């Protein structure tokens, strides 16, 4: 009987897949201490980031049932 592969729970909480198969995740350092940050920096933190090609190589191991 073949065993199921398990998704890493930390990756499940942090990453989402776009419809085209790219991996999206949130910016770091964007959850508090906004008084000392510029408005354009705060705006940048609201937007999701896309993982680069180097990090995409790890995704099948972390999330085997992702797209």
Swiss-Prot record:
**Molecular function GO labels:** structural constituent of ribosome
Instruction: Give me the segments passing through the membrane.
Output: none
Q: Which NCBIfam families match?
A: rpmI_bact (TIGR00001)
Q: What is this protein called?
A: Large ribosomal subunit protein bL35
Supply the alphabetized keyword list. Ribonucleoprotein, Ribosomal protein
Q: Which family does it belong to?
A: Belongs to the bacterial ribosomal protein bL35 family.
Give the species this sequence originates from.
Brachyspira hyodysenteriae (strain ATCC 49526 / WA1)
Top-rank lineage group of the source organism:
Bacteria
A single GO CC term for this protein reads: ribosome
Respond yes or no to whether keyword Ribosomal protein is given for this record: yes
What the entry lists under InterPro entries is as follows: Ribosomal_bL35 (IPR001706), Ribosomal_bL35-like (IPR021137), Ribosomal_bL35_CS (IPR018265), Ribosomal_bL35_sf (IPR037229)
Return the HAMAP family for the record.
Ribosomal_bL35 (MF_00514)
- Report the record's Gene Ontology biological process terms: translation
């Amino acid at each position: 009987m073949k065993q199921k592969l398990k998704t890493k729970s930390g990756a499940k909480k942090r990453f989402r897949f776009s419809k085209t198969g790219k991996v999206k995740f949130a910016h770091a350092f964007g959850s508090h201490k906004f008084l000392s940050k510029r408005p354009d920096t705060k705006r940048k933190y609201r937007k999701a980031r896309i993982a680069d090609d180097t990090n995409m190589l790890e995704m099948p191991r972390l999330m085997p049932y992702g797209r």
